[in-house]
Amino acid sequence: MSKLNSVLPAIAPHCIDMWEHFPTLRDLDANCTSVVEMGVRGGCSAYALAAGLERSSSKDKWMLYLDINDCRNPKLEELASEAGIKIEFRQTDSRYVELPECSLLFIDTLHTYGQLKTELDLHHTKAKDFIVMHDTDAPWGYKNEVDDGSPNRGLWPAIEEFLDDHKATWRLLKRYRNCHGLTILVRV
C-alpha cells in the first residue's frame, strides 16, 4: 500500500462528513492526470484525490488545491511529491481565480446556491472529464450555509440549473446521498 493510501484510514475518524467518499474519489481520480480542488478545510478530500492520482498511469500528474483560508498541508505535499505528483496550494477566493485546465475539478467551498452557481459558471470549461461536488445532500443540498441573498437555496438547485443549461456538454454520472452527498458530473 502506498503512503498516500495508508494515510486514509488514519484520517477517516477526523473526516466524518467525507470518509465514506474516499474510495469513490480515489477510484475516479485514478483515471485522471490532474486535479483542481476548490475548498480544502482539513484536507480530507485532498488526501483521497492525491491517493487516486498516484494510481494514474500518467507520467505528468499534478494537483492544485486552493482555499480562501490558509489550508496548506505540508504533509500532503510531501507524500504527493514522493508519489510523483506535482502539487501546489494557493490561498485565494475560488470566484476570482483563473484555473488551469484539469481532468477533474472538485468543489467543496461555501455551501450556498450563489457560490456554487458562480463557480460552475466560471470554471466548468476548465474540467475536461469530471466535476465533483461535496455536500450536495442534507443539510446543504437544499439550504444555504449562510444567507447569500440568492432566491434559491442550497447546492442541488444550482446543480440542476447547471445541468439544464449545459445538456450538450455535461451529464449527471452519480449522486451519492451518504456523508452529506457527493455528486459527480461527467463531460459528454
Where in this protein do the model-derived segments appear?
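A short alpha-helical cap/connector motif
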Residues: 1-188
